[in-house]
Amino acid sequence: MKIAIIQFGGTNCDMDVLHVLKDVVGVDAETVWYKEESLTGFDGVVVPGGFSYGDYLRAGAIAARTPIMDSIKKIASEGKPVLGICNGFQILTEARLLEGALTTNEYPKFRCHWTNLRVETANTPFTSKFRKGEVIKLPIAHMEGKFYAEEATLAELDENEQVVFRYVDEKGRLTDKANPNGSLENIAGIVNSSRNVLGLMPHPERASESILGSDEGRKVFESMADYITENF
């Protein structure tokens, strides 16, 4: 098993993800520069956080049009898992691998703090180690994290159980106060219709060891690794 961690100009969470995959979860992982045109030999992809190309035009817009994206789409089409974290989520929506868009926070400022999330489904390659309804704690760090989609798209995401994480309070309740960016329906993460592409704004790699304040994020990577082992 080998997982690719994609690096763009401005990516800054790649080494954190590499550490978690290799040293915490114990799987083979390797960084891949965006100019590469092939991901042959990789069984999964992580598109990490950062500020690719300075968020010019829109967050993720330039990265979504780089050479590596065709290979990421191919990986996804093969059913292999693709995980986009924060800027990675933005890139995946810009590349149309995921529905919706990430726009400027309702209160246009950078938000960096812990959030409570409710796991809406354990039926994905990334959440099999969670329980549906479980409340976990992960940090956010973004200015353009407000999830937006048309009403029909939101209804489809709900109907197909494609919403994976929602912002909640510590008791698991959906409240406006628990929503850090104004995301519609408190959405923090979604999967595609095939369920093998996940994007989320919170950072699981920053909550994968207890010394960081939470180790619940490691389950995202452990679930991903288990899925690859069982299917590829």
UniProtKB/Swiss-Prot annotation:
Predominant location category: cytoplasm
Keywords: ATP-binding, Cytoplasm, Glutamine amidotransferase, Hydrolase, Ligase, Nucleotide-binding, Purine biosynthesis
Cellular location(s): Cytoplasm
Gene symbol of the encoding locus: purQ
Domain of life where this protein originates: Archaea
InterPro entries to which the protein is assigned, alphabetical: Class_I_gatase-like, PRibForGlyAmidine_synth_PurQ
Species name: Methanosarcina mazei (strain ATCC BAA-159 / DSM 3647 / Goe1 / Go1 / JCM 11833 / OCM 88) (Methanosarcina frisia)
Protein name: Phosphoribosylformylglycinamidine synthase subunit PurQ
Subunit structure: Part of the FGAM synthase complex composed of 1 PurL, 1 PurQ and 2 PurS subunits.
Pfam families assigned to the protein according to its UniProt record, in alphabetical order: GATase_5
Pathway, per record: Purine metabolism; IMP biosynthesis via de novo pathway; 5-amino-1-(5-phospho-D-ribosyl)imidazole from N(2)-formyl-N(1)-(5-phospho-D-ribosyl)glycinamide: step 1/2
Active site residues of this protein: C86, H203, E205
One function term, GO molecular function aspect: ATP binding
SMART domains found in the cross-reference section: GATase_5 (SM01211)
